[in-house]
Amino acid sequence: MIEKTLKDVKGIIRVSNGETAPDLIVKDAEILDVFSRNIFKGNIWVYKSWIAYVGEKEPPIGDETIVIDAKGYFVVPGYIDAHGHADLFYNPSTFADFVVTKGATTVFSDAHDMINAIGVDGFIEVLKTSDKFAVKFLWGVPAAYPPYPKIEGGELFSIHEIWKLFSRYKECVSISELSPYTRVLHGEDNILERMLMARSLSKNIEGHTLGASYDKLNALVAAGITSCHESIRESDLKNRVRLGLYTMIRHSSIRSDFEQLCPVINSLPIDSMMLVSDGVFAVDLLEKGYMDHVIKKAIDFGLDPVVAII
């Protein structure tokens, strides 16, 4: 994310007021307003990297203003993947270079596979270069990896190392998906202490609650889990929405839950629901696309197009 300076804010205001020409204008576009869920014809004025104005007014045009004639085209916000795996099948840098061409601007990715391969120090180097990626990455830090350390070996991270990542790098926004949720239900000190620390820093806790009953979901939510991407039936979706989880509906290279769940979404409030990729094979990225493909498939399975995008 590019931080604004005071000079930047003043420049945005001057462009928005029509006092100076924008650097770029997208003209005569059909614009999707995600707040009112309406589509209107208008212009978008851009100053440097920021949108300064959206509406019907015509701006002053400077000698260096880039004008894009968008007549007949729809303009929508950049796509966000709220649960991906940018570290599993490819280098995050080359992944970012490709998916930005498919409309993605932000990706939340679990980092346990990357960290398992390159270690904590390698992951920190990735974080240090994050401003050079073509999309904004947000990362989940593994708090339970390997999932069952008594069987699979020692914990990848100490609680202090997790705390350092959360404290020093704003891109680390969550504990990555907790697949061994039975350890939470059994009240293991090790994992609960990590969850408490994360919540004390206002970080999210990604759930992986496949197969959890409504009663078990209650306990997991009470323990601090904030989301889940493992709804595969109508009851799963409704239970997670009811309990206040950020509820993610998946269309990935491994499995898709759209056919069962997209018709259900239309009957529920969507404020806490989102479409996610949960990992896409490289061949599928090249042949089908990324979140643009996810949105198209959701529409194919009956989701309202505007709802699918927002």
Predicted regions mapped to residue ranges:
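His/Asp/Glu-enriched, well-ordered alpha-helical/loop segment
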Residues: 264-310
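Histidine-rich, glycine-flanked metal-binding segment
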Residues: 2-25, 30-76
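Di-metal (Zn2+ and/or Mg2+/Mn2+) metal-binding site signature of metallo-dependent hydrolases
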Residues: 73-96
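Divalent-metal coordination cores built from histidine and acidic residues
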Residues: 2-16, 94-204
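Divalent metal-coordination and catalytic microenvironments
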Residues: 29, 49, 72, 83, ...
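Divalent metal-binding pocket/active-site signature
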Residues: 177-234, 251, 255
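Hydrophobic faces of well-ordered beta-strands that scaffold small-molecule active sites
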Residues: 78-86, 107-109, 137-141, 173-176, ...
